[in-house]
UniProtKB/Swiss-Prot annotation:
Protein name, UniProt field: Small ribosomal subunit protein uS11
Assembly mode: Part of the 30S ribosomal subunit. Interacts with proteins S7 and S18. Binds to IF-3.
Origin: domain of life: Bacteria
PANTHER family the record matches: 40S RIBOSOMAL PROTEIN S14/30S RIBOSOMAL PROTEIN S11
Gene name tied to this protein: rpsK
Family matches, as Pfam families: Ribosomal_S11 (PF00411)
Function: Located on the platform of the 30S subunit, it bridges several disparate RNA helices of the 16S rRNA. Forms part of the Shine-Dalgarno cleft in the 70S ribosome.
Keyword Ribonucleoprotein in record: yes
Length: 130
């Protein structure tokens, strides 16, 4: 006698946005790429972890390249063609993600490094001795 559970499938509406900003955040452990419009609204995002890489493989340049290819495919469905790229973080996936975005067919108009530099903020972690 109870109601049947109806699940609604949320369809992604196709926005027609020609240009946007790609935020590449590359840490020591992972690389996330978010493509937004000029106002900062997220259009598509991906990361090395969501692409199925686990553990230390997430921090590789290849994982960043696969994530960049995935996010570019999603953004091109919305009609995006030109990108400004903002790169942040010290990780190894910075350059490979940028190269993958260019290879996907985007016109990259500018590349900015927006890595936050502390003015003597938090104490850094101890040095690695190998």
């Amino acid at each position: 006698m109870g109601k049947e559970a109806t699940t609604r499938v949320r369809r992604r509406e196709r926005k027609n946005i020609a240009s946007g900003i790609a935020h590449v955040n590359s840490s020591f452990n992972n690389t996330t790429i978010t493509i937004t419009d000029a106002q900062g609204n997220t259009i598509a995002w991906s990361s090395a972890g969501t692409m199925g890489f686990k553990g230390s493989r997430k921090s590789t340049p290849y994982a960043a390249q696969v994530a960049a290819e995935d996010v570019s495919k999603k953004a091109q469905e919305h009609g995006m063609r030109t990108l400004e790229v903002e790169v942040a973080g010290p990780g190894s996936g910075r350059e490979s993600a940028l190269r993958a975005l260019q290879a996907a067919g985007f016109t990259v108009t500018s590349i900015r490094d927006v890595t936050a530099i502390p003015h003597n903020g938090c104490r850094p972690r101890k040095r690695r001795r190998v």
